[in-house]
C-alpha cells in the first residue's frame, strides 16, 4: 500500500489518535441508547416523552455513520509503506471475526433456550457477514439473533476495497481534495432520492417505512461505502496539509447541530443518509489534529480511552443483553409491553451495566488475545509482530469498532 504523502505526513502518519478512541465509545453508546430507547420510550406511554422519540431513534444511525466514516479515516491515516493486501485483510478479519463468532454462537444458544427458531436464513448469511447484501428483512434484521452485525457486512466490503481505493486516493491532486469531499458528501445526500425509484411495498416490520428504499439507503453495503470514502478523503486532506484548522469544540457543536436538525426536522428516510456524515468527518479530523498538536481533548481522558477500547465488544454484545437480559425483549410480546418510568429506568440501567461488563470480558478474553496472537504471521522462533499491530492506530477503530 502507498505511504502517506504530503507536508504533514511525517508528523502525523505514525501518531496515535487517542481522541478517536474515546469518540468510539460515544458512538457505540449512542447505538446502545437508541436500541434501549426504541423499546422503553413507547412502553412508558408518557406524552411528555414523545418529543424525544425522533432524537432517540436517530442516535443509532448517527453512531453507525460515525463508525463508517471513522474506518475510512483511520485506515487511510495509518496505511503503512510495504504493507500487503493479504496482511491488511488478515488484521481486519482477526479484529472482527473472533468477537463475531463468539456473540453469534451465544445468540444461537439463547435462541434455542428461549424456543426461537434457528434457521438458515437467520444464521448462515450472518455467519459469513453477507446479510446486508440480501434485501430480505428476515435475513438482514433477524431480531432474535445479533441483528447489529449487519454493519460488519458493510465493513467487509470496505476492507476488500481499501487496497484498491487507497492508491487512487493518493493520485488526487491536493488542491482538489475538498472538491472530491464535497462531491461524495453530496452524493450521500442524493441516495434517498435515488431510492424513490424503488417499490413502496413491502414496509419494514411494525413501521410504515418502505422496506426497499430503506434497505438501499441504510443497509446496502455499496451505498454505505460512500461514508467510508468520505473518511478516506478527510484523512488525506489532513495528511496533505489542507485541513482548515477547525478546533475540536466548534466541530462538536457543528456535529451536534446537524444531528438536531436532521433528527428533528428531516424525514427518517432522508435523515439516515444526510449531510450529518460531512459534519462527523469534520469532527473526526478535528479530534485527530487535536491529538497531533497536543491540544486539550476530553476524549483523551483515561476513562474514555478504556471505554473506547471496549467499544467494539460493547457493540457486539449490547443487542443480546437487550433481548435476553433485564428488558427481556425476546419474550412473546416483548416489543409491545407497558412499563412505568421507574421500571424503565431500572431496566435501562441494568442493561447498560451488564453490557459494559460483558463487553469488558469479551475484549479481555477474546478480542485482545486474538489480535495479539493472529494479527500477524508468526516469526521465526514463534514470536509475532502483534505488538506492531497494536502500536498502529488502525488497530483502534470500530469494526475496527
Please tell me what each predicted stretch does.
Residues 1-11, 304, 319-401:
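C-terminal "closing" transmembrane helix and its immediate cytosolic amphipathic cap
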Residues 15-80, 97-103, 121, 125-135, ...:
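Functionally critical transmembrane alpha-helices in membrane proteins and complexes, commonly lining
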Residues 18-21, 60, 124, 128-153, ...:
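Aromatic-enriched alpha-helical transmembrane segments of multi-pass intramembrane proteins
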Amino acid at each position: 500500500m502507498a505511504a502517506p504523502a504530503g507536508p504533514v505526513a511525517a508528523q502525523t502518519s505514525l501518531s496515535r489518535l487517542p481522541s478517536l478512541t474515546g469518540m468510539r465509545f460515544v458512538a457505540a453508546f449512542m447505538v446502545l441508547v437508541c436500541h434501549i430507547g426504541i423499546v422503553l420510550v413507547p412502553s412508558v406511554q408518557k406524552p411528555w416523552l414523545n418529543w424525544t422519540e425522533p432524537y432517540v431513534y436517530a442516535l443509532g444511525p448517527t453512531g453507525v455513520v460515525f463508525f463508517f466514516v471513522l474506518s475510512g479515516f483511520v485506515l487511510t491515516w495509518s496505511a503503512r509503506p510495504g504493507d500487503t493486501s493479504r496482511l491488511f485483510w488478515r488484521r481486519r478479519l482477526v479484529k472482527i471475526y473472533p468477537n463475531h463468532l463468539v456473540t453469534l454462537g451465544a445468540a444461537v444458544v439463547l435462541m434455542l433456550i428461549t424456543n426461537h427458531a434457528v434457521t438458515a436464513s437467520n444464521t448462515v448469511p450472518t455467519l459469513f457477514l453477507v446479510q446486508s447484501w440480501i434485501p430480505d428483512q428476515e435475513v438482514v434484521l433477524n431480531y432474535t439473533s445479533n441483528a447489529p452485525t449487519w454493519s460488519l457486512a458493510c465493513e467487509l466490503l470496505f476492507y476488500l476495497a481499501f487496497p484498491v481505493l487507497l492508491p487512487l486516493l493518493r493520485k488526487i491532486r491536493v488542491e482538489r481534495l475538498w472538491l472530491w469531499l464535497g462531491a461524495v458528501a453530496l452524493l450521500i445526500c442524493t441516495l434517498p432520492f435515488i431510492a424513490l425509484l424503488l417499490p413502496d411495498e413491502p414496509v419494514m416490520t411494525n413501521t410504515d417505512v418502505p422496506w426497499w428504499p430503506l434497505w438501499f439507503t441504510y443497509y446496502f453495503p455499496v451505498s454505505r461505502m460512500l461514508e467510508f470514502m468520505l473518511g478516506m478523503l478527510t484523512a488525506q486532506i489532513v495528511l496533505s496539509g489542507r485541513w482548515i484548522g477547525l478546533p475540536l469544540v466548534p466541530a462538536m457543536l457543528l456535529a451536534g447541530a446537524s444531528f438536531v436538525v436532521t433528527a428533528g426536522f428531516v424525514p427518517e428516510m432522508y435523515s439516515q443518509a444526510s449531510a450529518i456524515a460531512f459534519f462527523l468527518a469534520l469532527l473526526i479530523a478535528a479530534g485527530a489534529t487535536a491529538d497531533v498538536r497536543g491540544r486539550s481533548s476530553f476524549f483523551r481522558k483515561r476513562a474514555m480511552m478504556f471505554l473506547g477500547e471496549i467499544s467494539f465488544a460493547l457493540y457486539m454484545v449490547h443487542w443480546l443483553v437487550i433481548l435476553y437480559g433485564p428488558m427481556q425483549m425476546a419474550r412473546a410480546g416483548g416489543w409491545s409491553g407497558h412499563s412505568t418510568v421507574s421500571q424503565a429506568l431500572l431496566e435501562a440501567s441494568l442493561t447498560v451495566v451488564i453490557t459494559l461488563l460483558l463487553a469488558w470480558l469479551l475484549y479481555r478474553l477474546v478480542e485482545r488475545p486474538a489480535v495479539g496472537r493472529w494479527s500477524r504471521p508468526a516469526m521465526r522462533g514463534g514470536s509475532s509482530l502483534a505488538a506492531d499491530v497494536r502500536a498502529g492506530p488502525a488497530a483502534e477503530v470500530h469494526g475496527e469498532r
